[in-house]
């Protein structure tokens, strides 16, 4: 059965940027003698990619962000507008550059490493008109603008607008925002930041290496995050799927098996598809499945934007992979 159509607007607050994508034969090898297979430029950013996903799926999307008044900012806005994302709440920062990110992609695995090409653009004032939250279907905050997202999440909660937090990395500002969040979606990296630390006496580097090799108590981490406010918590685990906590129910979901070309933007596409499904009225498990399918389809293409699927493509993919 096809999911219902999404009608209310999804608002994404955070970063929109321009990605320079470099596909290497082997990112672990020295640059000298290595082979650059492809180079592309695409729009990116957690909130930016998520809102393009909403639009590709047939929903209404609006982004609250800040970009420079340079050529990079022009390209960012042009790309969003071409995808029918409302950019009326994007602040142009005078003298600002970018934001521009560089992604080095490993061809054998599809994994990538990010480097900041230009400084993150800061706005001297909060982004977004809070009045626009009235009647919105969902608010997504990506963690890149703590003051603005706390202000918006608090107002969204007051108005009864579902608030989704992209917790791709953990910062000291996140707990304050999570008190106003309905759905917290953590990356595995962020989840590891909340795991118990290694034994005293280890160097910081050795402690990090040990932590990355140890299995996580995912249920405990979900419960810890829920204790900060969000009644529903999701931890995405890449090729290992995801886990979720809905009230007292703890569940797991496998990832779809696909040929991975590039994982850039997969999490952002997941967040955008999840917001679309939330507004469309999908039940939590169906929504997680829908978002996982959208992210899997994206992984078959270079970059975070080129592979974002349409609603029809996701529905067909789910039909073909039923029971996987």
How would you name each of these model-derived features?
Residues 55, 81, 157-158, 226:
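Anion (oxyanion) recognition and catalysis
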Residues 1-12, 35, 198-324:
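Conserved phosphate-binding/catalytic region of the ribokinase-like
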Residues 79-95:
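A glycine-rich helix N-cap at a beta->alpha junction
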Residues 92-93, 103-143:
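Conserved phosphate-binding/catalytic loop of the ribokinase/pfkB sugar-kinase fold
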Residues 1-66, 71-75, 82, 108, ...:
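Glycine-rich phosphate/adenosyl-contacting loop at the front of the ribokinase-like
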Residues 138-220, 240-242:
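Conserved beta-alpha-beta core of the PfkB/ribokinase-like small-molecule kinase fold
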